Amino acid sequence: MTETPMMDDLERVLYNQDDIQKRIRELAAELTEFYEDKNPVMICVLTGAVFFYTDLLKHLDFQLEPDYIICSSYSGTKSTGNLTISKDLKTNIEGRHVLVVEDIIDTGLTMYQLLNNLQMRKPASLKVCTLCDKDIGKKAYDVPIDYCGFVVENRYIIGYGFDFHNKYRNLPVIGILKESVYT
């Protein structure tokens, strides 16, 4: 991999492109086994999960209906405590199997509130697939993670969709941002 100025802002790489793609293929095999006859609605939580979602879909061997949602319970880096949906689903999920695809579960607040919102729409089933689960000890919100790519340490993660002030998303690796960049 060619070094770029953005790579200089990494303390270290946690997962390279090969690691990420290998784990995505493994997750896709698990998902295919479960969903092969269910025609689920697969919801991408934008913007961070778009890289993971796109690569994951390429390896799934079953019929599905893609959809997208933009939501947050944060303003900047501060939690508002309330879920704001700025782009809702186009698909009616009542009676459908639903898989929410997320980039990372941190405290669990946003996902907890999103799952509560989606559950009110009466899906047949509701599951979560996240690329990363941040190891922060006991999470503030109990979120069931049905499929997880990696457990990452409690540091500022960037690359492959993860951002810092909307930068670094396009790094092809997952890494830890140097503390000097954000302090």
Curated annotation (Swiss-Prot):
PROSITE patterns: PUR_PYR_PR_TRANSFER. Gene3D superfamilies: 3.40.50.2020. It comes from the Eukaryota. The keyword Glycosyltransferase applies. One of its GO terms (biological process) is XMP salvage. It is found in: Cytoplasm. Its cofactor is Mg(2+). This is Hypoxanthine-guanine-xanthine phosphoribosyltransferase.
